[in-house]
Amino acid sequence: MSSHENQRRTFVIFNPASGRGAGAKRIDLYLDLLRKRLPEFEHAITSRPREESELAAQAVADGFELIVAVGGDGTWSNVADRLVSLGNPSVALGLLPSGTGNDFGRNFGISPRSPADAVDILARGVVTETDVGRVVSAGAPLGDAADQTTDESPVTGRHFLNLVGFGFDVAVIEDTAGAHFLRGELLYKVTALKNLFSFKGVAFELMSDEPGVDGDHLMLTISNAPFFGGGFPVDSPRPTLKVCLQSPQQRP
Protein backbone atom coordinates (compact mmCIF):
# COMPACT_ATOMS: atom_id res chain seq x y z
CA MET A 1 0.00 0.00 0.00
CA SER A 2 1.27 3.46 -0.83
CA SER A 3 2.19 5.99 1.83
CA HIS A 4 -0.89 8.25 1.40
CA GLU A 5 -3.31 8.72 4.29
CA ASN A 6 -5.23 5.63 5.34
CA GLN A 7 -8.42 5.20 3.28
CA ARG A 8 -9.39 1.76 4.53
CA ARG A 9 -12.69 1.20 6.26
CA THR A 10 -11.54 1.14 9.87
CA PHE A 11 -12.81 -0.51 13.05
CA VAL A 12 -11.08 0.25 16.37
CA ILE A 13 -11.20 -2.13 19.34
CA PHE A 14 -10.33 -0.78 22.79
CA ASN A 15 -9.35 -3.08 25.63
CA PRO A 16 -9.85 -1.01 28.82
CA ALA A 17 -8.30 -3.78 30.94
CA SER A 18 -4.95 -3.58 29.13
CA GLY A 19 -2.00 -2.23 31.05
CA ARG A 20 -3.70 -3.05 34.36
CA GLY A 21 -6.38 -0.45 33.64
CA ALA A 22 -4.21 2.06 31.81
CA GLY A 23 -6.11 1.23 28.62
CA ALA A 24 -9.32 2.68 30.04
CA LYS A 25 -7.61 5.99 30.75
CA ARG A 26 -6.40 6.29 27.16
CA ILE A 27 -9.71 5.69 25.38
CA ASP A 28 -10.79 9.34 25.22
CA LEU A 29 -7.27 10.45 24.26
CA TYR A 30 -7.08 7.98 21.40
CA LEU A 31 -10.60 8.78 20.19
CA ASP A 32 -9.71 12.47 20.03
CA LEU A 33 -6.47 11.77 18.15
CA LEU A 34 -8.15 9.34 15.74
CA ARG A 35 -10.96 11.77 14.91
CA LYS A 36 -8.36 14.36 13.93
CA ARG A 37 -6.47 11.99 11.60
CA LEU A 38 -8.93 9.47 10.15
CA PRO A 39 -11.81 10.46 7.86
CA GLU A 40 -14.16 8.08 9.67
CA PHE A 41 -14.08 4.95 11.78
CA GLU A 42 -16.22 2.88 14.11
CA HIS A 43 -15.18 1.55 17.48
CA ALA A 44 -16.10 -0.81 20.31
CA ILE A 45 -14.89 -1.30 23.88
CA THR A 46 -14.42 -4.79 25.28
CA SER A 47 -16.24 -5.76 28.46
CA ARG A 48 -14.77 -9.22 29.12
CA PRO A 49 -11.57 -11.19 28.45
CA ARG A 50 -10.82 -12.11 24.82
CA GLU A 51 -13.85 -10.25 23.51
CA GLU A 52 -11.49 -8.43 21.16
CA SER A 53 -11.22 -11.63 19.10
CA GLU A 54 -14.98 -11.80 18.63
CA LEU A 55 -15.24 -8.12 17.79
CA ALA A 56 -12.47 -8.46 15.21
CA ALA A 57 -14.21 -11.40 13.51
CA GLN A 58 -17.51 -9.52 13.40
CA ALA A 59 -15.82 -6.41 12.01
CA VAL A 60 -14.28 -8.43 9.17
CA ALA A 61 -17.68 -10.01 8.45
CA ASP A 62 -19.14 -6.49 8.30
CA GLY A 63 -16.62 -5.47 5.64
CA PHE A 64 -14.04 -3.51 7.60
CA GLU A 65 -10.57 -3.59 6.05
CA LEU A 66 -8.44 -2.26 8.93
CA ILE A 67 -8.87 -3.64 12.43
CA VAL A 68 -7.09 -1.48 15.00
CA ALA A 69 -6.34 -3.10 18.36
CA VAL A 70 -5.77 -0.69 21.25
CA GLY A 71 -4.02 -2.56 24.04
CA GLY A 72 -0.76 -4.39 24.62
CA ASP A 73 0.90 -7.53 23.34
CA GLY A 74 -1.88 -9.75 24.68
CA THR A 75 -4.64 -7.77 22.98
CA TRP A 76 -2.68 -7.52 19.74
CA SER A 77 -1.95 -11.24 19.72
CA ASN A 78 -5.59 -12.16 20.35
CA VAL A 79 -6.79 -10.01 17.45
CA ALA A 80 -3.98 -11.17 15.15
CA ASP A 81 -4.75 -14.81 15.96
CA ARG A 82 -8.35 -14.34 14.87
CA LEU A 83 -7.49 -12.35 11.74
CA VAL A 84 -4.92 -14.89 10.55
CA SER A 85 -7.35 -17.72 11.25
CA LEU A 86 -9.97 -16.01 9.08
CA GLY A 87 -7.51 -16.06 6.19
CA ASN A 88 -8.50 -12.77 4.53
CA PRO A 89 -5.30 -11.17 3.16
CA SER A 90 -7.06 -7.89 2.37
CA VAL A 91 -7.59 -7.14 6.07
CA ALA A 92 -4.82 -5.29 7.92
CA LEU A 93 -4.10 -5.04 11.65
CA GLY A 94 -3.34 -1.69 13.25
CA LEU A 95 -1.57 -1.35 16.62
CA LEU A 96 -2.09 1.37 19.20
CA PRO A 97 -0.31 0.84 22.55
CA SER A 98 -1.97 0.97 25.96
CA GLY A 99 -0.69 -2.25 27.51
CA THR A 100 2.02 -3.29 29.92
CA GLY A 101 4.78 -4.36 27.53
CA ASN A 102 3.79 -3.17 24.04
CA ASP A 103 6.85 -5.00 22.70
CA PHE A 104 5.68 -6.00 19.24
CA GLY A 105 4.88 -2.42 18.32
CA ARG A 106 8.52 -1.45 18.84
CA ASN A 107 9.34 -3.24 15.58
CA PHE A 108 7.43 -0.53 13.73
CA GLY A 109 8.48 2.49 15.76
CA ILE A 110 5.27 2.46 17.81
CA SER A 111 6.01 3.73 21.30
CA PRO A 112 3.60 3.72 24.27
CA ARG A 113 5.17 7.00 25.35
CA SER A 114 3.68 8.88 22.40
CA PRO A 115 0.04 8.09 21.52
CA ALA A 116 0.03 10.93 18.97
CA ASP A 117 2.96 9.43 17.07
CA ALA A 118 1.31 6.00 17.16
CA VAL A 119 -1.86 7.43 15.63
CA ASP A 120 0.24 9.28 13.05
CA ILE A 121 1.86 5.99 11.97
CA LEU A 122 -1.58 4.42 11.68
CA ALA A 123 -3.01 7.33 9.70
CA ARG A 124 -0.22 7.21 7.11
CA GLY A 125 -1.74 3.99 5.83
CA VAL A 126 1.52 2.15 5.20
CA VAL A 127 1.08 -1.61 5.48
CA THR A 128 4.10 -3.72 6.43
CA GLU A 129 4.10 -7.49 6.10
CA THR A 130 5.24 -9.43 9.15
CA ASP A 131 5.68 -13.05 10.11
CA VAL A 132 3.46 -14.83 12.60
CA GLY A 133 4.20 -17.98 14.55
CA ARG A 134 1.86 -20.81 15.39
CA VAL A 135 1.85 -23.08 18.41
CA VAL A 136 0.03 -26.40 18.22
CA SER A 137 -0.82 -28.70 21.08
CA ALA A 138 -2.45 -32.11 21.30
CA GLY A 139 -5.24 -31.96 23.84
CA ALA A 140 -5.76 -28.76 25.79
CA PRO A 141 -7.01 -25.72 23.80
CA LEU A 142 -4.63 -22.83 23.21
CA GLY A 143 -7.11 -20.02 22.89
CA ASP A 144 -9.83 -19.01 20.50
CA ALA A 145 -8.47 -20.45 17.25
CA ALA A 146 -8.67 -24.22 17.57
CA ASP A 147 -8.23 -26.58 14.64
CA GLN A 148 -9.55 -30.11 15.00
CA THR A 149 -7.69 -32.54 12.76
CA THR A 150 -9.62 -35.70 13.66
CA ASP A 151 -11.91 -36.79 16.45
CA GLU A 152 -9.29 -39.31 17.55
CA SER A 153 -6.37 -36.88 17.55
CA PRO A 154 -7.45 -33.30 18.28
CA VAL A 155 -4.82 -30.65 17.70
CA THR A 156 -5.40 -27.08 18.78
CA GLY A 157 -3.44 -24.15 17.44
CA ARG A 158 -2.85 -20.51 18.21
CA HIS A 159 -0.97 -17.85 16.29
CA PHE A 160 1.37 -15.42 18.01
CA LEU A 161 3.05 -12.17 17.03
CA ASN A 162 5.90 -11.60 19.44
CA LEU A 163 7.08 -14.82 21.08
CA VAL A 164 6.24 -17.97 22.96
CA GLY A 165 8.09 -18.45 26.22
CA PHE A 166 8.58 -21.06 28.90
CA GLY A 167 10.25 -20.73 32.29
CA PHE A 168 11.59 -17.40 33.54
CA ASP A 169 9.41 -15.11 31.44
CA VAL A 170 6.27 -17.02 32.46
CA ALA A 171 7.20 -16.51 36.12
CA VAL A 172 7.61 -12.78 35.42
CA ILE A 173 4.18 -12.59 33.76
CA GLU A 174 2.58 -14.40 36.69
CA ASP A 175 4.17 -11.92 39.09
CA THR A 176 3.01 -8.91 37.08
CA ALA A 177 -0.55 -10.23 37.21
CA GLY A 178 -0.41 -10.23 41.00
CA ALA A 179 1.27 -6.85 41.45
CA HIS A 180 -0.82 -3.85 42.43
CA PHE A 181 1.70 -1.06 42.84
CA LEU A 182 3.24 -0.52 39.39
CA ARG A 183 2.25 -0.38 35.72
CA GLY A 184 3.86 -0.51 32.30
CA GLU A 185 7.51 -1.17 31.57
CA LEU A 186 8.64 -0.47 35.13
CA LEU A 187 6.39 -3.28 36.39
CA TYR A 188 8.07 -5.76 34.03
CA LYS A 189 11.54 -4.60 35.00
CA VAL A 190 10.92 -4.87 38.76
CA THR A 191 9.34 -8.34 38.56
CA ALA A 192 12.04 -9.53 36.16
CA LEU A 193 14.78 -8.40 38.56
CA LYS A 194 13.08 -10.22 41.42
CA ASN A 195 12.79 -13.49 39.46
CA LEU A 196 16.31 -13.19 38.09
CA PHE A 197 17.67 -14.15 41.48
CA SER A 198 14.90 -16.45 42.73
CA PHE A 199 13.85 -18.50 39.70
CA LYS A 200 15.58 -21.90 39.69
CA GLY A 201 15.05 -22.96 36.10
CA VAL A 202 12.96 -25.59 34.30
CA ALA A 203 13.89 -28.99 32.89
CA PHE A 204 13.40 -29.08 29.11
CA GLU A 205 13.41 -31.98 26.69
CA LEU A 206 13.57 -30.73 23.11
CA MET A 207 13.49 -32.43 19.73
CA SER A 208 16.37 -30.76 17.90
CA ASP A 209 19.30 -31.45 15.61
CA GLU A 210 21.46 -29.40 17.96
CA PRO A 211 23.30 -31.43 20.64
CA GLY A 212 23.13 -30.64 24.33
CA VAL A 213 19.85 -28.74 24.42
CA ASP A 214 18.11 -30.96 26.98
CA GLY A 215 18.44 -30.17 30.67
CA ASP A 216 17.71 -27.36 33.10
CA HIS A 217 17.34 -23.91 31.57
CA LEU A 218 16.34 -20.52 32.89
CA MET A 219 14.00 -20.04 29.98
CA LEU A 220 13.12 -21.06 26.45
CA THR A 221 11.81 -18.48 24.00
CA ILE A 222 10.67 -18.90 20.42
CA SER A 223 10.74 -15.33 19.19
CA ASN A 224 9.44 -13.49 16.17
CA ALA A 225 10.70 -10.06 17.25
CA PRO A 226 13.68 -8.50 19.04
CA PHE A 227 12.00 -7.43 22.31
CA PHE A 228 10.00 -8.93 25.13
CA GLY A 229 9.03 -8.14 28.73
CA GLY A 230 8.76 -4.38 28.27
CA GLY A 231 11.81 -3.78 26.08
CA PHE A 232 14.29 -6.51 27.05
CA PRO A 233 16.27 -7.52 23.94
CA VAL A 234 16.10 -11.10 22.70
CA ASP A 235 18.20 -12.59 19.90
CA SER A 236 15.85 -12.87 16.94
CA PRO A 237 17.30 -12.53 13.43
CA ARG A 238 14.42 -12.07 11.06
CA PRO A 239 12.69 -13.38 9.00
CA THR A 240 13.03 -16.74 10.73
CA LEU A 241 11.79 -17.74 14.16
CA LYS A 242 14.62 -18.02 16.67
CA VAL A 243 14.80 -20.52 19.51
CA CYS A 244 16.77 -19.16 22.47
CA LEU A 245 17.80 -21.15 25.53
CA GLN A 246 19.40 -19.69 28.63
CA SER A 247 20.76 -21.83 31.45
CA PRO A 248 20.69 -20.78 35.12
CA GLN A 249 24.47 -20.29 34.92
CA GLN A 250 23.94 -17.62 32.23
CA ARG A 251 22.14 -15.16 34.47
CA PRO A 252 23.32 -11.58 33.81
Report each predicted region and the residues it spans.
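Short, solvent-exposed amphipathic alpha-helical segments in soluble enzyme
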Residues: 27-30, 60, 84-85, 177-180, ...
